A protein has these predicted regions:
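N-terminal type II signal-anchor transmembrane helix
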Residues: 1-52, 113
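Peptidoglycan glycan-strand catalytic modules in the bacterial/periplasmic cell-wall system
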Residues: 47-49, 53-237
Length: 237
């Protein structure tokens, strides 16, 4: 009897593993859900505003057909403070994984899924968050799509890691993120909130902006709601 139970468990495990492999292969091939083609992965579509300069080189304003004021910042234009804060907060093993942090994912499943701990932290890497920003943010319109969205993000994250360096992924993430208050991208956010360039962000300023990455509305430092401003300060500290 015990042997039959053990054999049945092995069969169930084998079937589950095969099903997982089939799902991920199907996602990678684009048979299930939306998988961006190589051309789109190599050239993601996110528009930047055009900066208008005066004769003496000062920025007078920005212009964009997309109705946002995102202005590009290269990796060299970013303060080490914003890079270190982002990695420490969102993806401490960013330099070690290839898109998926198995350890963080397992921890999140056990603590959140099994132990129901809200403060267990997430399992999403910076690469996964970028995948969501670029390709899957508006896809989950029904239950099936929501169930598939996370595996799709995993596959896209792994592909992004193949096509881009770690520095390029960080740069794309910070340029893409919407920091609210018409501050799309790190350059506009640094100017809007602190009146400086991204390369000049101090530790506490970088911590404040990175704190918004988890939930911009909840950690909005200039919100009219004092509770939200308090949340932003607590998150920063």
């Amino acid at each position: 009897m015990i042997r039959k139970i053990i054999n049945a468990l092995w069969v169930l495990l084998a079937v589950a593993l095969i099903a997982i492999v089939v799902v991920f292969v199907s996602i990678s091939k684009g048979w299930i859900g939306y998988m961006p083609p190589v051309e789109e992965l190599e050239n993601p579509n996110y528009k930047f505003a055009t900066e208008v300069f005066s004769e003496d080189g000062k920025v007078l304003g920005t212009f964009s057909m997309e109705k946002n004021n995102r202005v590009y910042s290269s990796y060299a234009d970013l303060s080490p403070n914003i890079i270190h804060a982002l990695i420490a907060t969102e993806d401490v093993r960013f330099a070690e994984h290839s898109g998926i942090d198995a350890k963080a994912l397992f921890r999140a499943i056990v603590k959140r899924g099994l132990l129901l701990q809200k403060s267990a932290g997430g399992g999403s890497t910076i690469s996964q968050q970028l995948a969501k920003q670029l390709f899957t943010e508006k896809v989950a319109s029904n239950t099936m799509q929501r169930l598939l969205q996370k595996p799709i993000e995993w596959v896209i994250a792994v592909k992004l890691e193949r096509y881009y360096t770690k520095e390029e992924i960080l740069t794309m993430y910070l340029n893409k993120f919407d920091f609210l208050n018409n501050a799309v991208g790190i350059k506009t956010a640094a100017s809007t909130y602190f009146g400086c360039e991204p390369k000049d962000l101090k530790i506490e300023q970088a911590a404040m902006l990175v704190g918004m990455c988890q939930n911009p509305s909840r950690y909005n430092p200039v919100s009219r709601n004092p509770k939200i401003r308090e949340n932003a300060l607590g998150r920063r500290n």
